Each structure stands twice: as structure tokens, then as C-alpha cells.
């Protein structure tokens, strides 16, 4: 008989018990996982935005760059911290992962950076719409502890803000042509 889950393991077991059995939850969480893998979905969305809205090309490219840089930052932090993914027997792992390292969640990091930059580009409150589902998906799938996800959101927000400021400075230095 296994030990009862405690701390963050208990939180994951509770989240999975409450949500994983609901229709569409695991399918949606897996879809988000595949979309966010290596920030590829955000980079593709940014490329499509740059093609569809040439007047906002630089802003859209900043979305892709920010998502990718946030992912890269998360990978570097993972390699330094080396925290293993959840492994308690009561936690169901519902998707494959590219590594055993969990801190921080690169999905939460790149999604938050992309959302911050999408909000600047589109005016839509993207962080409120995009970050919670991706963050929760990492718990439902059993591949991250809550602190992995929260830290990913914080790192992503910092990267998104920094890239947004840098992109603004670049656009301002280009002159009156704005985003072209």
C-alpha cells in the first residue's frame, strides 16, 4: 500500500479527482500540451499573425520571439534546478513529456509570455483567457507540481514584459513607419 499523497502531490490528486473524469477535460488538456510543446503553437500563431497583419508584423514577431525566449529560459532553469516530475503512484500521468524535469513549467512560461505580448498586439485580455487553462492542464495531466506552474507564469510574465519593452524601443527607433 502506498503512502497517502501529501503537499503538492495531494493537490495534484485532488485536481485530477475533480477534473480528469469530466468529458473533454483530458482531451483538451492534451491538445493544449501538444500546442504548447517547445512553444511551437505560439510561434506558429505569431507567424500567421505577422502574415495576416503586415502593419503589425513587428508586434506579431515579438509574440513568437517572446514565447520562444520564455521557453528557452524555462529549459535553462530546469537544467539548473533539476526537479523531477511528479511520481507519486496516486498521480496519473496523462501525457508524454520530453524530459523528467519539471521546474518550471515551460508550457506555463511560454504561454504567459505569448499572452502578455498578444494582449499588447491585439488589445484582447489574453493572459486572463489563455494562462489559466494552460496552467491547469499541466496539473490535470499530472506532469507538473503547482509551484512549477506558478513559477512558469511568473517567469513568462517577466519575459513577456521585457520583450514587449524591447520591441517597443525597436519600433520607436525605427521612426514614423511604426510596426512595418
From Swiss-Prot:
GO terms for molecular function: hydrolase activity. It is a multi-pass membrane protein. The chain crosses the membrane at residues 31-51, 61-81, 116-136, 139-159. Its EC number is 3.1.3.111. GO terms for cellular component: membrane. Disruption phenotype: Non-essential, can be deleted, but cells laking this gene show a reduced growth rate. Deformation and bulge on the side of mutant cells are observed. The cytoplasm is detached from the cell wall and possesses a discrepancy density compared to wild-type cells. The content of D-arabinofuran residues (Araf) is reduced significantly. It holds the Pfam family PAP2. GO terms for biological process: capsule polysaccharide biosynthetic process; cell wall organization. SMART domains: acidPPc. Phosphatase involved in the biosynthesis of decaprenylphosphoryl arabinose (DPA), which serves as the arabinose donor for the biosynthesis of arabinogalactan, the major mycobacterial cell wall polysaccharide. Catalyzes the dephosphorylation of decaprenylphosphoryl-5-phosphoribose (DPPR) to decaprenyl-phosphoribose (DPR). This is Decaprenylphosphoryl-5-phosphoribose phosphatase. It comes from Mycolicibacterium smegmatis (strain ATCC 700084 / mc(2)155).
Amino acid at each position: 500500500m502506498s503512502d497517502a499523497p501529501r503537499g503538492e502531490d495531494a493537490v495534484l490528486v485532488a485536481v485530477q479527482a475533480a477534473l480528469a473524469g469530466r468529458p473533454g477535460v483530458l482531451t483538451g488538456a492534451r491538445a493544449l500540451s501538444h500546442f504548447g510543446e517547445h512553444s511551437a503553437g505560439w510561434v506558429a500563431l505569431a507567424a500567421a499573425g505577422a502574415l495576416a497583419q503586415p502593419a503589425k508584423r513587428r508586434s506579431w514577431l515579438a509574440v513568437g520571439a517572446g514565447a520562444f525566449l520564455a521557453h528557452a529560459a524555462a529549459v535553462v532553469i530546469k537544467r539548473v534546478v533539476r526537479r523531477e516530475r511528479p511520481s507519486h503512484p496516486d498521480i496519473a500521468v496523462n501525457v508524454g513529456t520530453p524530459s523528467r524535469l519539471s521546474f518550471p513549467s515551460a508550457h506555463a512560461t511560454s504561454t504567459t509570455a505569448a499572452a502578455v505580448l498578444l494582449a499588447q498586439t491585439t488589445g484582447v485580455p489574453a493572459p486572463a483567457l489563455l494562462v489559466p487553462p494552460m496552467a491547469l492542464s499541466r496539473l490535470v495531466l499530472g506532469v507538473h507540481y503547482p509551484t512549477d506552474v506558478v513559477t512558469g507564469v511568473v517567469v513568462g510574465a517577466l519575459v513577456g514584459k521585457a520583450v514587449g519593452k524591447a520591441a517597443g524601443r525597436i519600433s520607436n527607433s525605427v521612426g514614423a513607419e511604426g510596426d512595418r
